[in-house]
């Protein structure tokens, strides 16, 4: 049954999608250029997928979009303003390897809601709703770090949703998961976007990208090589790096 997000989005009904833009962004480390004059825009599509070979800068781009790191050159804006504390809180980030407290599942969610200054009387109901969304009602009092990989990832996603984001960034959320766990994550992504939260997803899985993406941003060597609707990307990619990647020829 679809989850009712009204408890976390009651004050957001009039809020437009939060556009995020990277303009001439560069990042270097140890004399090596990781992101090179990157220009991209995350707009109104419900689900954007970032693809590209290893080392293309996909995970780094997610961190730039969320403000977890600052660029060496260029500008990151959200809602037309430079990324700062006030608009960063509208952008959630879930890492490939979940970072969970050494406490119970319930306590992890309680901690996230406390950070949003949610009153104790409201936290109880919200925790139950988040547990239901994640399918973890039966594991509420279990140690979070004792969950399976798929369960930990679902917990991380709903914990991020507790912060009422407009945009949720997911860094390879199904990497190393079995097909059943992958399906559960994809259902959760469906529910999240159905509720009006935009999802930006990094994946190497072309099948998953076909299932989930409205649009694809293809990165190559720290630059944006292609930004097209998903159907166009998979049927008739424009750039040579994208064509080579889909044909299995592009490794680096």
Regions found by a protein language model. Give the residues of each.
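Conserved ABC ATPase "signature" region
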Residues: 121-139
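Conserved ABC ATPase signature
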Residues: 143-147, 151
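Conserved catalytic motifs of ABC-family nucleotide-binding domains
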Residues: 164
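Catalytic Walker B motif of ABC-type/P-loop ATPase nucleotide-binding domains
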Residues: 168-171
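Helix N-cap at the start of a conserved alpha-helix in ABC-type nucleotide-binding domains
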Residues: 179-181
